[in-house]
C-alpha cells in the first residue's frame, strides 16, 4: 500500500496544531513556575525587580506583594493550560507581562522588559490562534478524527 502525500491543508493543520500546543504549554507552565518561585526565590530574588516607585506605593512589604503576584501567575498559567478559556487567559497573561515590563522599565531593567514584551506579543498570538486552533488540533489527532467519522 502506498501512503498518499499529505495535502497542503493537512500540513497546515499540523503546523497550526504544533504552534498552538507549544504556545499553550509555554504560557501555561512558565507562569506557574514563575508564580511558585515567588514563594521560594530559587530562580531569582524577585523583590529586586520591583521598581522603587511601585514599592513605595504598595500597602505591603515587597515580599508579600510578590506572593500576591505569584498567586495571580499560578492562576493565569492554570487558566491557559487546563481550562476551556485558554483564549481569555492568554490575553490576561499578555496584559500581565506588559505590566511587568512597565515595572522593569521603571526599575531600569530594560533588557528583561524587552523580553517580557516579546513574550506578551507571543501570548497575544496564542489568544488569536485560539480562534482556529482547536479545530486544527482535532484534525491532526487520529483518535478525534476516528470519533468524528464514527
List the predicted regions and their residue ranges.
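Membrane-interface extramembranous regions
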Residues: 1-150
